[in-house]
Amino acid sequence: MQHTRHNNARKLFSEIDLNPQNYLIIHYSCESFYDIKDGHTPRITSIAVYAYATAQTDSFSIHKVAEKSHIQISDIELHYDELEKKMLDEFFAYAKEHSNFFWIHWNMRDINYGFKAIEHRYSVLGGIPYNIPDEKKIDLARQLINCYGVGYAGHPRMEKLLEQNDIKAKDYLNGSQEAAAFANKEYVKLHM
């Protein structure tokens, strides 16, 4: 069983390497889902999509939408739903335009954190999300486990992988740091 998962993951990594023009890498930042007491879904602050073949990044963020709307960063909270809706309008238009791509992500697989969470949030704000089909989503975290087994890196795995490979991640924030940046209204930090 593990041997089959390992081989399938290796084939997938080879396919990505041979055809990078078919792959996008996505990450997003949101309000902490652990600190919400009233039951609302976490607000999305930014989404970054990196084209693997060209190394170009398209980003969708609250502070950029605020700037285009002539709203000061200090006033974002007063207009958050409106700005978030505009940001997600842009993101879902982009997703629809890139429907033929595969989306590589890290643990974005449920309603708490993932594509479903972004779709739900957009629906709450009155939008109609474009649904990226599950067969177009590649969970890199899961594929690394498939390839190397559960013990390939300690927890938190992303940070441990950075350490193991001596990678200095510029502007990297872990989940709790992202949540703190949101709470402190440091929206630009969440965009990086």
Regions found by a protein language model. Give the residues of each.
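Conserved non-catalytic scaffold segment of RNase H-like nuclease domains
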Residues: 2-116
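Metal-dependent phosphoesterase core characteristic of DEDDh/y 3'-5' exonuclease domains
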Residues: 43-45, 50-71, 101-192
